Design a protein with these regions (language model features):
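Acidic donor-binding loop of glycosyltransferase active sites
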Residues: 27-42
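A charged, aromatic-enriched C-terminal amphipathic alpha-helix characteristic of glycosyltransferases
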Residues: 83-131
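Active-site donor-sugar recognition loop in glycosyltransferases
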Residues: 22, 40-43, 65
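Short hydrophobic beta-strand element within catalytic cores of glycosyltransferases
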Residues: 32-34, 50, 57-63
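Short alpha-helical segment that forms part of, or immediately flanks, the ligand-binding pocket
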Residues: 24, 46-54, 70
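Short acidic alpha-helix that forms the nucleotide-activated donor recognition element
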Residues: 19-30, 53
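Nucleotide-activated donor-binding/catalytic signature segment of Leloir-type glycosyltransferases, i.e.
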Residues: 1-22
Length: 136
């Protein structure tokens, strides 16, 4: 990452650890967000939903074939998955060109990822607790 930042200092900015508020504000200013997917095949990181909620184009670098995040990136209309194990630079260039200055509004993101919203989580917890306490 440092090599790319040094080579393209006006285009790529790498931030060390920052607060959530600063990270979110910085992402809102970005033209494109970059996600480096996990190498674990049993975990979907919550950060991807933060990325989607901003509505910016997201380039996802997928490191493993069975990445559990892939299905979410496939649903998000402004995403491109760059398979690190089988890259296609031409498609990435097309995506970046076509996604320039485009956004997805929050209502659309909330609809696409209804099962990742706070409301869905709260309803699920409420249902589980209701089921537990109704069994007694």
């Amino acid at each position: 990452m440092q090599a790319f930042c040094a080579k393209y200092p006006d285009n790529i900015i790498h931030h060390e650890a920052v607060s959530f508020d600063r990270a979110f504000a910085t992402m809102e200013k970005a033209d494109v967000l970059l996600n480096l997917s996990n190498t674990l095949d049993n975990m979907v990181p919550s950060k991807i939903f933060d990325y989607f909620s901003i509505g910016k184009p997201v380039v996802n670098v997928q490191k493993i074939k069975n990445c559990p995040s892939r299905e979410y990136f496939d649903r998000y209309p402004l995403s491109f998955t760059f398979e690190d194990f089988a890259p296609n630079n031409y498609d990435l260039k097309n995506f970046l060109h076509n996604a320039k200055n485009k956004t997805v509004n929050f209502e659309t993101v909330s609809t696409l990822f209804k099962d990742a919203t706070i409301e869905f989580a709260a309803a699920t917890v409420e249902k589980v607790l209701t089921d537990i306490f109704n069994d007694k």
